[in-house]
Design a protein with these regions (language model features):
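Short E/K-rich amphipathic alpha-helical oligomerization segments
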Residues: 29-55
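Short, charge-rich amphipathic alpha-helices with coiled-coil/heptad character
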Residues: 1-13, 46-49
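Amphipathic alpha-helical coiled-coil segments
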Residues: 10, 14-24, 28-31, 61-64, ...
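Generic secondary-structure transition motif, activating predominantly at the C-termini of alpha-helices
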Residues: 18, 22, 50, 83-86
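Long amphipathic alpha-helical coiled-coil segments
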Residues: 70-92
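Generic structural signal of hydrophobic/aromatic residues within well-ordered alpha-helices
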Residues: 6, 42, 78-81
């Protein structure tokens, strides 16, 4: 069943996802620029003693790295739900 409230809620969730994805991408890019490498390279460099980084900074970097695909997947699911809702609403 389609209602404006459902569509508004899905649109709101889509906007949240987009905002979080952009912020996360920006943080990942800033860290990559700061350290001159991406997370997998940084982890390797740390294990080899070629990188000094605070434990919390590395944990935050890893959290963002792992969260990004989850947010992207969530965004796709919301977009699909909204598209399905609009298709089913157009049948009535």
């Amino acid at each position: 069943m389609h209602t404006d409230e459902y569509e508004i809620s899905l649109a709101r969730e889509i906007n949240v996802c987009i905002r979080v994805i952009k912020q996360t991408q920006m943080k990942l890019a800033q860290r990559q620029q700061l350290f001159g490498m991406d997370l997998p390279q940084a982890s390797k460099a740390l294990n080899e003693g070629r990188l000094v980084i605070e434990r919390q900074e590395l944990a935050d970097w890893r959290d963002d790295f792992e969260a990004l695909p989850q947010w992207e997947q969530r965004l796709e699911q919301y977009r699909e739900a909204l598209a399905t809702m609009r298709i089913s609403a157009s049948r009535f």
